[in-house]
Design a protein with these regions (language model features):
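Conserved positions in beta-strands of structured domains
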Residues: 19, 33-36, 89-92, 142-144, ...
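Sec-exported extracytoplasmic/periplasmic mature domains
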Residues: 19-23, 40, 53, 70-77, ...
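Surface-exposed binding/hinge segments that line
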Residues: 47, 82-124, 145
C-alpha cells in the first residue's frame, strides 16, 4: 500500500474516486454522476458513469465499486483509507451503474471521503495478489514503467472518458532519494 505523499501524487493520476473537489473545495461528480442522500443522512445512493473503462479495457460497474470498498475495509489489506469509511455499515450494487452506501450514523464528510475510494478491478487484484507493482485504474494516465529509485512513467489513457484529457501523452516522475536535494 502506498502511504508516502510522493506516491499519492503518482497514484492520483492512475486511480479516481467517485467524487472530486473543485477549486472552491466543493464536491463534484467524478466516477459518480449524481447522488441522493436520505433525509436521515444514513443512505447514499450514487449513480455511476456508464462510459468508464479500466486500463485493461473492461467496463467499470457498481460491483467494482463495492469490491474496492470491501477491499479497503478488509483488515488484511491494511489500507490507510479504511478510517475514512469506518462509519459505513454496508455497500451494495443496486444496479449495473448504481451503488448504495449505508452509514451507522450521519457523517457529513462521507461524500467528500468518496474522493479517496479508488476503484479497482477484482480480477487484477486476484491475479496479482496486490497492487504494489501493477496498477490498473480508470484515471487519465496508465502505469507504463517503473525503474526503482529512478523514475515512474505514466502514459495517457486513450479510453479516458473526459474529452480532451489528458492534455499530454506522458508524465514522468523522477525519484530524488536524497531529501536535501529535493528542494
Amino acid at each position: 500500500l502506498v502511504t508516502a505523499f510522493s506516491s499519492f501524487v503518482v497514484i492520483q493520476n492512475i486511480y479516481e474516486g467517485l467524487v472530486e473537489f473543485d477549486a472552491d473545495l466543493q464536491v463534484q461528480p467524478a466516477l459518480a454522476t449524481s447522488w441522493e442522500i436520505s433525509d436521515d443522512g444514513l443512505t447514499y445512493d450514487l449513480q455511476l458513469r456508464d462510459d468508464v473503462v479500466f486500463h485493461n479495457g473492461r467496463p467499470m460497474t457498481a460491483e467494482d465499486v463495492v469490491y474496492s470498498f470491501e477491499r479497503i475495509m478488509a483488515e488484511e489489506t491494511g489500507s490507510p483509507q479504511a478510517s475514512r469509511f469506518a462509519q459505513v455499515t454496508g455497500a451494495e450494487a443496486t444496479g449495473e451503474h448504481a451503488v448504495r452506501f449505508t452509514l451507522e450514523a450521519p457523517f457529513a464528510p462521507f461524500l467528500g471521503n468518496l474522493s479517496r475510494l479508488a476503484v479497482v478491478p477484482r480480477e487484477v487484484v486476484e491475479a496479482e495478489g496486490d497492487l504494489q507493482r501493477v496498477a490498473v485504474g480508470t484515471g487519465a494516465f496508465m502505469l507504463d514503467e517503473v525503474v526503482p529509485d529512478t523514475y515512474v512513467r505514466l502514459v495517457a489513457n486513450p479510453d479516458y472518458y473526459r474529452d480532451g484529457q489528458p492534455a499530454t501523452e506522458e508524465v514522468r516522475f523522477n525519484v530524488v532519494p536524497e531529501a536535501s536535494t529535493r528542494a
